[in-house]
UniProtKB/Swiss-Prot annotation:
Domain of life of the native organism: Bacteria
SUPFAM superfamilies: GIY-YIG endonuclease (SSF82771)
Family: Belongs to the UPF0213 family.
InterPro entries the UniProt entry points to: GIY-YIG_endonuc, GIY-YIG_endonuc_sf, UPF0213_domain, UPF0213_GIY-YIG_endonuc
Gene transcribed to yield this protein: yhbQ
Organism whose genome encodes this protein: Escherichia fergusonii (strain ATCC 35469 / DSM 13698 / CCUG 18766 / IAM 14443 / JCM 21226 / LMG 7866 / NBRC 102419 / NCTC 12128 / CDC 0568-73)
UniProt protein name: UPF0213 protein YhbQ
Lineage, opening ranks: Bacteria, Pseudomonadati, Pseudomonadota, Gammaproteobacteria, Enterobacterales
Amino acid sequence: MTPWFLYLIRTADNKLYTGITTDVERRYQQHQSGKGAKALRGKGELTLAFSAPVGDRSLALRAEYRVKQLTKRQKERLVAEGSGFAELISSLQTPEIKSD
């Protein structure tokens, strides 16, 4: 299983873009070259502010959604300290269902 990553990219006007990928460096280069998300095109210099492995695609999609719901201040705390990231991921993981 290919691991998925959550990443945040900072734009020149200090906004944070959140995305997921299996290859952070490749995806960052796509954004830099204008071949990534439309939201980042023409936004000036981009910097990779944060990235972390999150598990499978399903978990990555849930983590991306949850991070996009955070306030700017909470995202900045995540970037600066990784604050709460482990808790966020563990809260998204579904408990295993045991069969008898």
